From Swiss-Prot:
Entry's transmembrane regions: none
Assigned protein family: Belongs to the UPF0758 family.
Motif range (JAMM motif): 211-224
Residue ranges of domain MPN in the record: 140-262
Ranges annotated as biased composition (Low complexity): 22-43
Residue ranges, annotated region (Disordered): 1-45
GO biological process, one term: proteolysis
Record's keyword terms, sorted: Hydrolase, Metal-binding, Metalloprotease, Protease, Zinc
Protein name in UniProt: UPF0758 protein BTH_I0781
Database matches in InterPro entries: MPN (IPR037518), RadC_JAB (IPR025657), RuvA_2-like (IPR010994), UPF0758 (IPR001405), UPF0758_CS (IPR020891), UPF0758_N (IPR046778)
Binding residues annotated for Zn(2+), in chain numbering: H211, H213, D224
Amino acid sequence: MQYEIVSAGENVGDEPERERPVAQAAAAPGIPRPAALPAAGAARRGRDLPRERLLARGPAALSDAELVALLLGSGLPGHDVFALAHTLLTRFGSLRALLDAAPDDFKGLRGIGPARTAILVAVVELARRALAEKARERPLVDSPGAVDDYLRLLIGTRPREVFVCLFLDARHRLVQTEETAHGSLTRMAVYPREIVRRALALNAAALIVAHNHPSGAVRPSAADRHLTRVLRDALALVDVQLIDHFVVGANDTFSFAQAGWI
């Protein structure tokens, strides 16, 4: 990615309905016993089982498709909710891609209307907010794993490059996260002057910056290293510390600080 570095001059109820046991017919010569459950009851029991396992054993006991099915709630005529969940995972390629999808990505998908779209999008937003809340509770330099998780969830699977700034207070706790630049397929214009201005407006004492590589490869380019030096020097002029620059992929991150490049 080439950078343009622009200078100053430029269901009601929580309890599932339980199946009532089918009475066993008296054993009589030549008369078979009835099935333990009718077909419809078996299907409903199958739908309830993941919910019961989650409550009894925790969410880790469920597969990705089962967790998605719990979010969806019900299926379509002729297709149960598990088939719908599998269809979604196949359509998007992975759970991460499904949950990172924008609302428009669900348009035209059979069985996914506005209500289910809102649920799927809200789940990821809740996760982002929970991680941001965690980042505000203690210095980010003391919890690098939380920073990695937050950044991967925030920009790790974006289809285009995004440059984000994490503005920190004097104790290195998160004050605010802002997306300061968005790239095309080949370029992204980053304005150090504007980043400095926002740091001063937010009374930030330090910054962590990050951008994603949609390819998934997180090794920094020469342009990434040059941008980091320019931004570090611009912030130093106003006594704001650049703590780290992360390059983020869907499954990995690269830290300039850990590499000794800041």
